[in-house]
Amino acid sequence: MMSNDLFSKWLGIEIISIKKGYCKLSSTISKDMTNGFNLAHGGICYSLADSCFAFTANSLGKISLTKSAEISYLKKVELNDTIFAECKQNQKNSNVFAVNVFNQKKEEIALFKGIAHFTNKDWL
């Protein structure tokens, strides 16, 4: 999936681990990811969490699409921070996924919740 995901590549997202029902990603905040306050734009954290959610849901074997997603920001993210997103399937056959986002100091910076729609199409 990552090989076709140009947006995740553009963000510099790196896969740390991916297996059935689990994914962990990272990204380092560069100058072009900051807002007018020289902090990471909120969309960067959201996008990392969204990609982590998508990779986790699709790792289950069926092509999945996002039905809904939301994020709560807990801490600011600064230039040169490395942020991590970790997602695991909560319950077998569940379509609700939680993604925890934290920084290199292991401080939780955001909570993301996504609801997936699973299609009948298999991932090849």
For the regions a protein language model found, what residue spans apply to each?
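HotDog/MaoC-like acyl-thioester-processing domains
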Residues: E78-L79, Q89-L124
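Hydrophobic beta-strand-centered segment that forms part of the acyl-chain substrate-binding groove
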Residues: A54-I83, Q89-N90
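Compact, glycine-rich, soluble single-domain proteins
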Residues: F37-A54, N58
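Beta-strand residues in well-ordered beta-sheet regions across diverse protein folds
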Residues: S26-T28, E86, A98-N100
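Catalytic strand-loop segment that frames the active site of acyl-thioester-processing enzymes
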Residues: F7-A40
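A generic structural signal for short beta-strands and their flanking turns/coil linkers
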Residues: K9-L11, G21-C23, L65-A69, D81, ...
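N-proximal, solvent-exposed amphipathic alpha-helical segments enriched in charged/polar residues
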Residues: M1-L6
